Swiss-Prot record:
GO terms for molecular function: large ribosomal subunit rRNA binding; structural constituent of ribosome. The gene is rplN. PROSITE patterns: RIBOSOMAL_L14. Keywords: Ribonucleoprotein, Ribosomal protein, RNA-binding, rRNA-binding. This is Large ribosomal subunit protein uL14. Pfam families: Ribosomal_L14 (PF00238). Part of the 50S ribosomal subunit. Forms a cluster with proteins L3 and L19. In the 70S ribosome, L14 and L19 interact and together make contacts with the 16S rRNA in bridges B5 and B8. Binds to 23S rRNA. Forms part of two intersubunit bridges in the 70S ribosome. GO terms for biological process: translation. One of its GO terms (cellular component) is cytosolic large ribosomal subunit. Belongs to the universal ribosomal protein uL14 family.
């Protein structure tokens, strides 16, 4: 469960390391984002000489959450931390590699490029 001001790790090689959620997309009164939801983030830490810079804003999709997420079959999934992958307006990842596992819920939300780049889908 991600809300405004939540800090997330970045799970790709776009150059950003830490981002902060500044908006949850999908409705004017929406408070929380779960697995597979798109958020607007501000880049707080970035490596020098990369595609994104500190202080820029970007869109990101949540790929891992520390809060457990209940699936339709009744099982739960949770991860050690909150992570996101930076995407462009066309919902394609900015980076060319994804680090760590991602949730299966991304497949239902049509993030196939992220699914194919991920080393493991849980």
């Amino acid at each position: 469960m991600i809300q405004v001001s939540t800090h997330l790790e970045v799970a790709d090689n776009s150059g950003a390391r830490i981002v902060k959620c500044i908006k949850v997309l999908g409705g004017s009164r929406r408070k929380y984002a779960a697995l597979g939801d798109v958020i607007v983030v501000s880049i707080k830490e970035a490596l020098p000489g990369t595609k994104v810079k500190k202080g820029e804003t970007a869109r990101a999709v949540v790929v891992r959450t520390a809060r457990e997420y209940q699936r339709s079959d009744g099982s739960y999934i949770k991860f050690d931390g909150n992570s996101a992958v930076l995407i462009n307006k066309e919902k394609e990842p900015i980076g060319t590699r994804i680090f760590g596992p991602v949730a299966r819920e991304l497949r239902a939300k049509k993030f196939m490029k992220i699914i194919s780049l991920a080393p493991e889908v849980l």
